[in-house]
C-alpha cells in the first residue's frame, strides 16, 4: 500500500511531467533556441537588422519565460500571480530563479524595448541579452525541467 509521502511524490512527478508538455514551456524552449541562433547570426554578420532580430526574439523569450514560470507556480498551487514581477518574485522565493534583481532588470529592459527609439539604448539591451539575459533564460529552463 502507498503511504501519503509516496502519493505526494507521485503526484508531484505527474505535475512536473504535465508541466513539461505545457505550450508556454515548449514555446519558451524554442524561443530561446531561436534567440541563440539570432545571436550567432549577429556575431557572424554584424548587421543591425540582426541586432534588431535579437531584441525581438528577446521580447518573445521574456513573455514566454514569465508565463511558463506562472504556469509552473499555478501547478504548484499558487494563485494571484498575474504580473511578470509578481511571478518572478515568487519564483525567487521558491528558489526557481537565483537572482531576482537580474530578472527585474530583464523585465525592465523588456519594457524599454517597446519604446526603443535610440541606438544607444538598443545597443545596451543587446549587450545585456548577450552577456546576461540568455544565461538567465537557460538557467530557468533547466530549473523548470527539474
Role assignments for model-derived ranges:
Residues 2-146:
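Solvent-exposed interaction patches of small proteins and small membrane subunits
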Amino acid at each position: 500500500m502507498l503511504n501519503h509521502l509516496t502519493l505526494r511524490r507521485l503526484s508531484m512527478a505527474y505535475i512536473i511531467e504535465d508541466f513539461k508538455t505545457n505550450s508556454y514551456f515548449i514555446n519558451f524552449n524554442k524561443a530561446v533556441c531561436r534567440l541563440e541562433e539570432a545571436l550567432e547570426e549577429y556575431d557572424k554578420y554584424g548587421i543591425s537588422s540582426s541586432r534588431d532580430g535579437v531584441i525581438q526574439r528577446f521580447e518573445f523569450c521574456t513573455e514566454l519565460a514569465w508565463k511558463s514560470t506562472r504556469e509552473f507556480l499555478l501547478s504548484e498551487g499558487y494563485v494571484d500571480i498575474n504580473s511578470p514581477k509578481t511571478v518572478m518574485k515568487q519564483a525567487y522565493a521558491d528558489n526557481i530563479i537565483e537572482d531576482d534583481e537580474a530578472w527585474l532588470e530583464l523585465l525592465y529592459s523588456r519594457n524599454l524595448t517597446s519604446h526603443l527609439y535610440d541606438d544607444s539604448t538598443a545597443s545596451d539591451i543587446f549587450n545585456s541579452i548577450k552577456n546576461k539575459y540568455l544565461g538567465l533564460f537557460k538557467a530557468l529552463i533547466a530549473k523548470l525541467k527539474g
